[in-house]
Amino acid sequence: DGKTIDQMSIQRIEHIIESLKNETYQPKPAKRVYIPKKNGGNRPLGIPSFEDKLVQEVARMILEAIYEGHFESTSHGFRPYKSCHTALTHIQHQFTGTRWFIEGDIKGFFDNINHNILIDTLRERISDERFLRLVRKFLNAGYVDNWKYNRTYSGTPQGGIISPILANIYLDKFDKYINEYIERFNKGEKKRRNAVYFQKNTQAVNLRKKLKVETDPCVKAELTEKAKKLQIEMRNIPCSHDMDENYRRMKYVRYADDFIIGVIGSKVDCEKIKADITKYMSDVLNLELSAEKTLITHAQDTAKFLGYELSVRKSYAMKRN
């Protein structure tokens, strides 16, 4: 807009405050720029004017004070003390024993946020209609691309200071829906024990007892060799049954518009979860999950999340893509 931070003065700040009070403040269209994506395309960013950045930062601080304490712990994007690393650590610690991954992909999320749904969601916690009208002004401000003005009817511009927290507020409903879904889905206290493993374990305990009291070197060497072989056998035998129809678990983590679900259960369970969350996204949030990119992947193969490949062997292995 031709104005810089160096030109900021008390008078200019007072003018902004007054225009906010009497609701004459009108955000300027964001300047659209493009940055290259890894897949070869371009990602559009909307760069606000300096005054709009200033007002948006104040609005962001207000929204954060209202909402941060109510967000779910499974949300890791654009939040204080959370990051890609905390999301991956969450997976490493919480997704133990996962048999299937569901990779979530929301089609054009930032461009398709429904303004009316977002404002109604904000209204559930914010009673100040003047503040809500200001947020709507930012949503409707539009953008300038190649000197041409374009109005925005949906979405929140990537590059806007309040866009990340508005995105989290929008998807917080989904986070809470998933947590309720998990409570209904989970079943059983623990997996059914594998009788073969515990039979071998009993043999190992008895061998160790014999070794403690045995004095004959030849017999002791023979018992030691048996114990070693038994230990090797036990490494390849699970202590519980992988497929226990009376035991199910579901885990979830989200970073911005990327999410992944871990399931201990059957592929049929995963297909139902995918169908249910697709319907919720469409019916409640007016968003579309990509049928091609929302994948169900066996945990022994690799699922992608935040640029990492996730798989389950005897322990989690995460390697940089």
Please give the residue ranges for each predicted region:
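Non-catalytic terminal/accessory segments
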Residues: 1-321
